[in-house]
Amino acid sequence: MSFQKTILRKTWWGLEAKSYTEIAQELPSQDESLRKWIAIYAVYHLNFENRHPGESYYKFLENAKNSKYVIIEFTLPIHFLETRDSIGANDTTITKCKTMETEEEINSFLYENNINPELFTPPWTCEYPLD
């Protein structure tokens, strides 16, 4: 009998409790000039209605605002990380972007895409480049 792996409870509860807006992990890249990440955003924590003046969200978050979660997978040239003070979503190449409503949907997506859910962490522990 085999059990499907899930996101570690400590990490998931941190996302649900608003300790962080996203959890992420770095993935292996087939291209040595690129780094690759996957992140799960708790979109329902974001305030799309009453923002501070000038505050904006990444386009993938704006597009997902009617969903509870969004998963984004993207690559980023290593050269950008080495030469720029900040990184934006326009610097990335999005390879997957999918909205979801439940933890079960997320776990199924991760399983189908051979992504180990136990490796998700808060963004600062995996050098996640998007703020």
What is each PLM-predicted segment?
Residues 1-51:
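Negatively charged, low-complexity tracts enriched in Asp/Glu with abundant Ser/Thr
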Residues 4, 21, 59-61, 70, ...:
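Compositionally biased, low-structure terminal segments
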Residues 7-8, 15, 32, 36, ...:
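Alpha-helical structural elements
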Residues 18, 39-42, 55-56, 67, ...:
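Intrinsically disordered, low-complexity segments enriched in small/polar residues
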Residues 44-96:
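Acidic, low-complexity, intrinsically disordered interaction modules
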Residues 77-131:
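Mixed-charge, Lys/Arg-enriched low-complexity segments
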